[in-house]
Amino acid sequence: MADKFDANDETRTVYAVVYDNDQPVSTGQFLAETKIEARLTRIVTLADYCGCGYGAKVTEALETYTRREGFYQLTIHSELTAQTFYENLGYQTYGPKCLEDGEYCQSLAKTILKWEKNMDIAMLIAIVGGLLGCYLYLTKNN
């Protein structure tokens, strides 16, 4: 599993890991993208342990962390072979499929916290600001 780590690992990553005795058999990473959105990445289970539910447990543990920390949405950029796995966990596809490193990939998202009446105005401003930033980025790059 050592090859599943990257530059983000040393600074801002939260992990969930499933062990079989002392061996890590499934893991995943949480990365905060904005104050309201986060990304799950590098969710992997060793081949001998696939089908045991460990990938789902890792994903659910990271979702629990996401909820507790107050994030509203999670995104995942997944190879097509794992798309159904994430859809079964409540993720929905968005955007076009793309080819990366010889593999077709798809972005998926899941709302973790719903907007509630008592949420403060600062959060509303953060959401509107994020949407405006996305609009400006898309306008500039299209």
From Swiss-Prot:
Keywords: Acyltransferase, Transferase
Keyword Transferase recorded: yes
Pfam families with a match to the protein in the record: Acetyltransf_10
Enzyme class: transferase
Organism superkingdom: Bacteria
Domain named N-acetyltransferase: residues: 1-120
GO MF annotation list: acyltransferase activity, transferring groups other than amino-acyl groups
Keyword Transferase annotated: yes
EC number of the protein: 2.3.1.-
InterPro entries, per database record: Acyl_CoA_acyltransferase, GNAT_dom
Family in the record: Belongs to the acetyltransferase family.
Protein name: Uncharacterized acetyltransferase SpyM3_1195
Organism field: Streptococcus pyogenes serotype M3 (strain ATCC BAA-595 / MGAS315)
Lineage of the organism: Bacteria, Bacillati, Bacillota, Bacilli, Lactobacillales
